[in-house]
């Protein structure tokens, strides 16, 4: 909240003019912060290496900090670093409780490792003779806390998070997510004055792995990691990360290794015929180092090492949003995603903390998306969908944490179209307008949208398939800039106008499939 100068001055004079009172808190519940550039961050797979290499680069190469032994020349010259000036963009913050384990896990896969270790111990299985643990090595010390006893092994910690009731904050984070797609200094950047466009990780010419940027405020008290989404086929213009993007989309968001039908090549060997799939096999595949969720562990750990006293946030669009959410769930970090596919499916396979032990409002995860996006809504599947045609098995629809759902189909009259998935469309045509508040006495539109997920998804999928069958998708283009109507004489408020977050409590993925041990 912005406090004018006279009010700030009065806060110093009041103690002398009034009777003593209990001391106030050191910081207000809501405040606004801004950022400036400081670093660059690179990530790549070097020759004959099974794990990715990370490096951090300051504005001056002489001040570079290496996370691993990696030649600085491979990143590029100083001209690749962002030089951002222009409009001031700010983020409003507030305090929020987030549930975290008292002992922090070393990695994302530590949750799966701990689950496997406890299962083996409970069943009396000797790990040395068990062939099901080739990919998941068991942890030496860390054990996942019991969600049934939150008071003993968990802490509800008050942390600073982005205030997502503030529309400008939602827009600023979305622009950071958009910037994760673009090479620093290249076309498409949103200029962020007083924000730190730092560490553009993964932008080496031959890098095909995790990409994005890191932002930090002037005091290094808040650091934001933005992660790039998919850059291939139906979702973008391609690029060096296209192959890895598609592989990870199909591994994370498909029911069983992207084995959609006989014509598809699976991304793992877990299919057991019919609608059966190997559960342990899927879990092993998800902890592979080629998966962005595990690569993100190295990124998060290095950022926390560089900024040990900072609050770390994550944000991203599409695949980048899902990866941000998985990292946030693993380490108890706030994450805001945009148009993310449903990532409850991979989160459950990684045994990350989920309800009922982890309440949605204490997870720190918030998903922002709209009802005309078939990918985020989980309906971009089936033989007539654009995702199927491009080779993407986007079969999941359920999200962790809380959801801010923009009902663009009802309010704006949009039709379901994969092109509305692009982050630029979301920023310019969804977030730019203040959203209408719910009329008093009426039940929540967002609660209804989530509670009736199956019915809504089936209707949207049928409409999407029908549009392609008619071959009139170019005519079926109902998502122009038509926003909520303003009151006569009213102004466009900069803040507010954001739907209320709700949890997707009744959502179920892959209901046709049966998961178990079929070997």
UniProtKB/Swiss-Prot annotation:
Q: Which residues are glycosylated?
A: 48, 133, 196, 220, 302, 309, 361
GO aspect biological process, one term? neutral lipid catabolic process
What reaction does this catalyse?
a triacylglycerol + H2O = a diacylglycerol + a fatty acid + H(+)
Residue numbers annotated as active site: 318 (charge relay system)
- Origin species: Cryptococcus neoformans var. neoformans serotype D (strain B-3501A) (Filobasidiella neoformans)
Q: Tell me one GO molecular function of this protein.
A: phospholipase activity
Family to which this protein belongs: Belongs to the AB hydrolase superfamily. Lipase family.
Gene name of the record: ATG15
GO CC annotation: endoplasmic reticulum; multivesicular body membrane; vacuolar lumen; vacuolar membrane
What is this protein's name? Putative lipase ATG15
Cited Gene3D superfamilies:
alpha/beta hydrolase
According to its record, how does it sit in the membrane? Single-pass type II membrane protein
**Region Disordered: start and end of each range?**
481-502
| Main enzyme class | hydrolase
């Amino acid at each position: 909240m912005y406090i004018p100068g006279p009010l700030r001055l009065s806060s110093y004079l009041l103690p002398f003019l009034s009777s003593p009172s209990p001391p106030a808190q050191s910081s207000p519940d809501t405040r606004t912060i801004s950022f400036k550039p400081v670093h660059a961050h690179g990530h790549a797979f070097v020759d004959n290496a099974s794990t990715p290499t990370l490096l951090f680069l300051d504005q001056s190469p002489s001040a570079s900090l290496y996370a691993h032994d990696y030649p600085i020349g491979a990143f590029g010259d100083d001209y690749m670093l962002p030089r951002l000036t222009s409009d001031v963009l700010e983020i409003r913050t507030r305090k929020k409780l987030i549930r975290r384990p008292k002992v922090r896990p070393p990695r994302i896969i530590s949750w799966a490792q701990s689950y496997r270790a406890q299962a083996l111990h409970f069943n009396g299985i000797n790990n040395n003779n068990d062939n099901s643990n080739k990919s998941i090595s068991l942890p030496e010390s860390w054990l996942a806390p019991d969600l049934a006893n939150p008071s003993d092994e968990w802490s509800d910690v008050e942390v600073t998070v982005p205030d997502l009731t503030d529309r400008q904050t939602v827009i600023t984070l979305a622009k950071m997510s958009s910037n994760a797609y673009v090479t620093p200094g290249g076309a498409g950047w949103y200029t962020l004055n007083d924000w730190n466009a730092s560490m553009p990780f993964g932008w080496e010419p031959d890098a095909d792995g995790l990409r994005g940027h890191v932002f930090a405020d002037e005091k290094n008290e808040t650091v934001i990691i933005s992660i790039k989404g998919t850059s291939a086929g139906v979702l973008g213009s391609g690029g060096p990360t296209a192959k890895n993007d598609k592989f990870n989309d199909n591994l994370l968001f498909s029911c069983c290794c992207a084995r959609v039908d006989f014509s598809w090549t699976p991304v793992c060997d877990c299919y057991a015929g019919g609608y059966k799939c190997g559960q342990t096999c899927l879990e092993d595949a998800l902890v592979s180092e080629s998966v962005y969720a595990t690569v993100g562990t190295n990124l998060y750990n290095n950022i926390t090492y560089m900024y040990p006293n900072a609050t770390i946030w994550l944000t991203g669009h599409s695949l980048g949003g899902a990866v941000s959410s998985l990292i946030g769930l693993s380490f108890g970090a706030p994450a805001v995603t945009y148009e993310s596919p449903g990532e409850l499916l991979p989160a459950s396979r990684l045994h990350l903390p989920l309800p009922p032990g982890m309440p949605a409002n204490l997870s720190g995860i918030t998903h922002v998306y709209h009802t005309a996006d078939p990918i985020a809504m989980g309906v971009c599947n089936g033989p007539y969908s654009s995702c199927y045609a491009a080779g993407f098995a986007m079969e999941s629809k359920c999200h962790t944490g809380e959801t801010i759902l923009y009902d663009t189909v009802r309010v704006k009259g949009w039709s379901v179209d994969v092109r509305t998935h692009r982050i630029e469309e979301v920023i310019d045509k969804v977030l730019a307008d203040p959203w209408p508040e719910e009329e008093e006495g009426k039940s929540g539109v967002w609660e209804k949208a989530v509670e009736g997920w199956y019915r809504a998804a089936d209707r949207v999928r049928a409409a999407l398939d029908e549009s392609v069958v008619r071959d009139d998708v170019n005519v079926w283009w109902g998502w122009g800039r038509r926003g909520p109507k303003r009151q006569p004489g009213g102004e466009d408020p900069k803040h507010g106008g954001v739907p209320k977050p709700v949890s997707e409590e009744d959502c179920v993925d892959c209901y046709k499939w049966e998961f178990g041990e079929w070997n």
